[in-house]
């Protein structure tokens, strides 16, 4: 109401470039993208740029207001990692002519207009499901929070393909919708255990969910991995400290930050030559520990 603007905004308007880039991601993914900061800043710092980390709400009205506020600033570029990319987002970015790189795969994004760097979530899901099958598990539940159709489709695609290859059960009851948190995983696991409907194995879309499943199993006297296999996703620091140690997916988040930043600066610093938008797909790694029945040395890493 008093026309206050942060100092960096005022100063930026005094030069042709603000030396600011924004990294936009969903609030729910705050922990997931925490490691990307080092990757982005390692490249941005070399070029004298500052990275603004902008968590965006899921609720549509707040989301729209936050995005408008951010793009009203003088940005030299942005990296987009929100769970969704709507036509109105594209229109807003085009109107402001902000160079943009996508850090997720979006079906809605024009492939001929934006550079894209993303992690192959379908491959991650496929590899983990294959590992669970190789450990002798057939009924493998997939636990995730149904908040992003794009992520859900990729996650389910890999799981379903691996099960189909082995003619393993793929019924809808094995798709377990739960909040992406320890409390969410715990509540869903308790519900399944109380009802006698727990699958042989549960592959969770986050380590936090998996920790909740482990807690529920412990309270109910269910032995992991002898009676229930549990797998996570994201290789959080606690995954090697819980009991049993958690088998999970190691995602190249730091590398994602480096490549996305390099792509963005290629656009920002383009001297006028035609640059064809490119796509870089980063592959995950499987970090095998004890929670799914593995008896090999802990931390064996498979490409």
Q: Which residues fall in each region the model found?
A:
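Alpha-helical recognition/docking segments in bacterial nutrient-uptake
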Residues: 16-130, 134, 193-194
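Short acidic/polar active-site loop segments enriched in Thr and Asp
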Residues: 76, 138-140, 198-200
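N-terminal helix-turn-helix DNA-binding module of bacterial transcription factors
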Residues: 1-17
